[in-house]
Amino acid sequence: GLADRPIRWLVDDCAKFVAREKRRGNTYDGIIMDPPSYGRGPGGEIWKLEDCIYDLISQCEEVLSDTPLFFAVNSYTTGLSPAVMEYMLKTTLVPRFGGETSCDEIGLPVLMRPSYVLGGQNMIVAYTKADVIEYMGVITEHVDMDHPVLLDKYILGTECEVDAICDGENFLIPGIMEQVERTGVHSGDSICVYPAQHLTQAEIDTMVDYTGRFARELHVNGLVNVQYAVSNGKVYVIEVNPRSSRTVPYISKVTGVPMVDLAVRCCLGEKLADMGYGTGLHPNAPYVAVKVPVFSFEKLHGVDTQFGPEMKSTGEVLGIAPNYHDALLKGLIGAGYTFKTPGPASCCIFTVKDSDKPEFVDIAWKLKSMGYKLYGTSGTCAWLNKHMVPCNEVRNMSGESPNIVDLLQSGLVDYVFSTSAKGRDPKRDSVRLRRKAVELSIPCITAVDTANALVDCLRSDHSLENIPLVDIATLYHRK
């Protein structure tokens, strides 16, 4: 919440807190303030910490004169600008995606984003030059153009995330998290698995090495978050955030490493080696924990449900089990996904972009073998039939009745699988289809990897009745 508030509010809140605690007779050795690198002002404008850090310090000294104040910031924390990021990657010898000023130089597809992004807002993957032109209009309409629009090469791969604690010299990684959805889906909207299930030991060692380099180069005394992409065995860095992240509570809970406590002690000058949790990569827990995002699309009218670089989830649930598939099933059920035995007339609808069609053949075949009747729009239907998966054609949203809307309203559709090749225009048939599914409370899957995870759980003979309950407090000993 603080990222959306003017900087002086941080000072005022801090001063009020200290005054209230003093009245109660409580005193403190000091206060650690970790203000966001940038946020939105009262008029919606982007402000950067680097522009007001000295003003913030002077205000804090004035109102907190007798209480020591520790800032969890350093020379880089005030927002890793593209130039600073590029310099750091060169000095640490870590590879990254190519970044230029023209999509002709980079090569399509490209990730387009404003210089300063909150929650992936207005970040888009462009697959064609027409997409670049269309999306540039979207970005410039909503973003202050005092800062450039950035282009990065988009590489399809597995996305992983690391939260680490550093004392300025040594570092501790409680665990490496792997996302089910591939790169291009915001980490907050992706299913997240700990420990990582599909990384080689060499890839894990590389991430640990790179994270240590970043922590030392940034002179971190506290927390740092790094996001990686793995493609064809090579590890690339997506972004480095010298701050806490939304995954800290998750990874702390499932590993038993109290990250915030340790980070605070590092801020105050203690060393990780003296804290009892070791350094480097912490040993994996004896179970699997799956974090599944929760969405509120039924309350957000007009919002497209298609996954992408812009975050849309409003919460998350946690599934824990001895193995990955059981933990995933728990998480999906907790997030509101329904798992039911198909009836004699139960059906699924497929309408997917060309690049996803090959991967959806296996998904469709699995659903067909379970007893579902399959329907698809013209292109998807033709593709599935061509590859020996019986499918019935259904007219799209703008077609004559009976069309896909009538089928959705029939009460027979259990799942909709819809992926778009185009933008977010609410008048597009694909966007209208997904919104209609939301209105009718029909699960709508918009990513290949999510579809694979869902179908694997549907085919499993496990249910909540035969998956053991897990008491997380008994799985490790808190220190």
Annotate each PLM feature:
Residues 28-42:
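Conserved proline-anchored active-site loop of SAM-dependent methyltransferases
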Residues 112, 125-126, 151, 175, ...:
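General beta-strand structural signal in soluble alpha/beta enzymes
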Residues 44-106:
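C-terminal substrate-binding/active-site "lid" region of AdoMet-derived donor-dependent transferases
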Residues 27-29, 108, 413:
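Local beta-strand N-terminus motif with an aromatic residue
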Residues 1-30:
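S-adenosyl-L-methionine
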Residues 349, 367, 371-384:
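Short internal beta-strands
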Residues 121, 395-479:
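Peripheral docking tails and interdomain loops at the edges
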Residues 119, 127-343:
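ATP-dependent carboxylate activation and anion-phosphoryl transfer catalytic cores
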